[in-house]
From Swiss-Prot:
Taxonomic path: Eukaryota, Viridiplantae, Streptophyta, Embryophyta, Tracheophyta
Ranges facing Extracellular side: 62-69
Pfam families in the cross-refs: SecE (PF00584)
TM regions (residue ranges): 33-61
Annotated localization: Endoplasmic reticulum membrane
Gene Ontology MF term list: protein transmembrane transporter activity
Gene for this chain: SEC61G3
InterPro entries xref list: Prot_translocase_SecE_dom_sf, Translocase_Sec61-g, Translocase_SecE/Sec61-g
Similarity annotation: Belongs to the SecE/SEC61-gamma family.
Residue(s) carrying N-acetylmethionine: M1
Matches recorded under SUPFAM superfamilies: Preprotein translocase SecE subunit
Listed name of the protein: Protein transport protein Sec61 subunit gamma-3
Oligomer and partners: Heterotrimeric complex composed of SEC61-alpha, SEC61-beta and SEC61-gamma.
Organism from which the protein derives: Arabidopsis thaliana (Mouse-ear cress)
Primary role: Necessary for protein translocation in the endoplasmic reticulum.
Length: 69
């Protein structure tokens, strides 16, 4: 019986913690959602520009290295 309890107790604690987390969570209002969406979009654009400029810099370097053979 003790082996069963030792296997079930962590599951019970996890379930209690999960229920507590779901009860504390709230759905974002329109203003908060818009703010998160805009910041995420800005992050995507910035990462895209960084990738573009890295590619732009390394294309000539790669051509110099490969072209010298």
């Amino acid at each position: 019986m003790e082996a069963i309890d030792s296997a079930i107790d962590p599951l019970r604690d996890f379930a209690k913690s999960s229920v507590r987390l779901v009860q504390r969570c709230h759905k974002p209002d329109r203003k908060e959602f818009t703010k998160v969406a805009v910041r995420t979009a800005i992050g995507f654009v910035v990462m895209g520009f960084v990738g573009f400029f890295v590619k732009l810099v390394f294309i000539p370097i790669n051509n110099i290295i490969v072209g010298s053979s």
